[in-house]
Amino acid sequence: MGGTFDPIHHGHLVVASEVASRFCLDEVIFVPTGRPPHKKEVSDPWHRYLMAVIATASNQRFSVSKIDIERTGPTFTVDTLRELREQLPSSDLFFITGTDALARIFSWKDADTLWSLAHFVAVSRPGHEVVDIPNDRISFLEVPAMAISSSNCRERVRSGLPIWYLVPEGVVQYIAKHGLYRSLYG
């Protein structure tokens, strides 16, 4: 499951759990992006990685990969999937993404190659519909509605509002300890 995870929140965890259950996945690997080319301001990759580790620690089916944050330069999904395919040649790879991200998939680097590297699972998010993508390339899954977004969590911290129950407790503590999101970007 790729994402910025800035910060990771309960919505991400519910999606991962639902997809793992629906598709009988042995493991869900969370892959925090290193330097996403489409986002200018993101927290340090290692902060995002550690928050993902904290958030997923209690679920044995979840793990977190450093694959993207150890790569230099911009992070592209196609490069990540190629590297995972090399590391896990006999595994069926599923790429979990939101329908909002999927709406932009044809603008991604080497978009036509993505379909041969993994099966895509698009999870519905409120207000985002995807059209003009062949259904044989993607499985669509509706999960329980959770109106949580990372950008809203960051804004709440910046405004001095609580994020308890939006993100795992350990992540709340990590954000406070490291002073993340207190300024416009920090």
From Swiss-Prot:
Annotated SUPFAM superfamilies: Nucleotidylyl transferase
The pathway noted for it is: Cofactor biosynthesis; NAD(+) biosynthesis; deamido-NAD(+) from nicotinate D-ribonucleotide: step 1/1
Keywords for this protein: ATP-binding, NAD, Nucleotide-binding, Nucleotidyltransferase, Pyridine nucleotide biosynthesis, Transferase
Signal peptide range equals none
Q: Which domain of life is it from?
A: Bacteria
GO MF terms, alphabetically ordered:
ATP binding; nicotinate-nucleotide adenylyltransferase activity
Q: What does this protein do?
A: Catalyzes the reversible adenylation of nicotinate mononucleotide (NaMN) to nicotinic acid adenine dinucleotide (NaAD).
Name of the protein: Probable nicotinate-nucleotide adenylyltransferase
The lineage is: Bacteria, Bacillati, Actinomycetota, Actinomycetes, Micrococcales
Gene this protein is translated from: nadD
